[in-house]
Design a protein with these regions (language model features):
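HIT superfamily nucleotide-processing domains
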Residues: 47-173
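Short cysteine/histidine-rich metal-coordination sites, predominantly Zn2+-binding motifs
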Residues: 8-15, 42-51, 70-71
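Short Cys/His-centered divalent metal-binding micro-motifs
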Residues: 23-45
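Short Cys/His-rich "knuckle" micro-motifs
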Residues: 1-9, 35-39, 64-67
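Short, cysteine/histidine-rich loop/knuckle motifs that typically chelate Zn2+
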Residues: 1, 29, 55-59
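Histidine-centered nuclease catalytic patch
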Residues: 1-25
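Activation segment
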Residues: 13, 34-36, 95
Length: 173
């Protein structure tokens, strides 16, 4: 748990008021770093976490896990245990994720990896991947990270791993 502080968007010493419209919540560390030196307004970022797209199949999912991210089983798994980890906020580009979302996704990836290893001793490796944009193969425009369990001998020659997205480049020459 992190302590929250009330912060003035426009600091009082720069003419900011005590009105509600000029206040935001920041964690104690962020507030201490911001101090009264700038008028950075973080409220829009906080509000953006609630954005959902009514037409997005991932935005419609109600799953536990974390307030910023969650995990689901892939409906078209490459291997048994194939999971998708994604932010709750509707955002299509991996590179547009906010750092707290990346942190939540990373935490869930680690937890799911541990869970899979404890329940299936045949797992000997993982592929972790993101398709960012249609030209990279992204078909659902809501960021999702694939966690794909691998097993010894699940394919003849796995060397090259994710390089296989361009088949002629998978083999190291």
């Amino acid at each position: 748990e992190t302590q929250l502080d009330v912060d003035h968007v426009v600091p009082r010493n720069k003419g900011g008021s005590n009105e509600l419209a000029n206040l935001q919540m920041l964690c104690r560390t962020c507030n201490a770093q911001k101090r009264d030196n700038d008028d950075t307004d973080f409220r829009a970022i906080t509000e953006s976490y609630g954005f959902r797209d009514a037409d997005c199949i991932f935005c419609q999912k109600e799953c536990g896990d974390d307030e910023l991210a969650f995990v689901v089983e892939d409906e078209y798994p490459v291997t048994e245990g194939h999971a998708l980890v994604m932010p709750r906020r509707h955002v299509s580009d991996y590179f547009a994720l906010h750092q707290p979302e990346r942190n939540a996704i990373e935490r869930i990836l680690h937890n799911r990896q541990k869970e899979l290893l404890s329940r299936d001793p045949s797992i000997s490796g993982f592929n972790v991947g993101v398709n960012s944009g249609p030209s990279a193969g992204q078909t659902i425009l809501h960021v999702h990270i694939h966690l794909i369990p691998r097993r010894d001998d699940d394919m003849d020659d796995p060397r090259g791993g994710v390089r296989g997205v361009i088949p002629e480049k998978q083999k190291y020459l």
